[in-house]
Amino acid sequence: LHRLIRRQRQMCIRDSYGVQLFDLAGQTRPKAMYFSEVMSYIQLTGVIFPYISEPNINIHQPAYGISSTMCHELSHICGFMREDEANFISYLACYNSDNTELRYSGAMMGLIHATNRLYRYDPNAWQEIYTLLPEGVLRDLAANSRYWKKYETPVGETADRWNDAYLKANDQTDGVQSYGRMVDLLIAFYRAQGLI
């Protein structure tokens, strides 16, 4: 897995959008977290250690999420502290990449947040869209759900409450819901592009 994160980090560095994130972040490079499964138990895919500004990545998560997590954490290093903004910047960096794996990572992150939001508001529309997704994407979504379901424990719920309180204390009034607010930024972006 450490090789995987090194390879994905190298892809980010070579990619034009990834280069911009790495340039802005200075010499900071994401590192594989040795205790990645512990991060899964507390429902984290990445974290910045505040005093040394070091992005650490949960490499135990589904592999396609590693690149978007790296870009998300690098967005924080670049000064974008709001979770919705970091997710949106990560989406743009990955999705506009020349690398297929990076594009897929960003697309899956955007898809997961968008379909989760849609399901809350209109389960019928969600079902309609879900049936249109390619078989490989459906397999990855099912694997993602199975993976995170294993970590829905009292420890995870407590960590989620702590993260929610931390975000709210840092002026992100939506708390953990702010991660999914990237959908608002996606909609605004695609509207500005005249695509919706």
What are these regions (language model features)?
Residues L1-I13:
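Single conserved hydrophobic/aromatic residue that forms the stacking wall/gate
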Residues Y17-L21, I59, C78, R82, ...:
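Sec/Tat-exported extracytoplasmic proteins
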Residues Q20-L24, T28, F35-S40, P55-N56, ...:
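A cross-kingdom signal targeting lumenal/periplasmic-facing segments of multi-pass membrane
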Residues Q27-M70:
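Active-site scaffold of zinc-dependent metalloenzymes
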Residues N56-H60, C71-C78, T100-E101:
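Second-shell loop/turn segments in exported
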Residues S68-F80, D84-N87, Y91:
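Active-site recognition of the HExxH zinc-binding catalytic motif
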Residues F88-D140:
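Active-site/pore-lining binding-face segments in mid-to-C-terminal subdomains
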Residues G136-I196:
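Pan-zinc metallopeptidase signature
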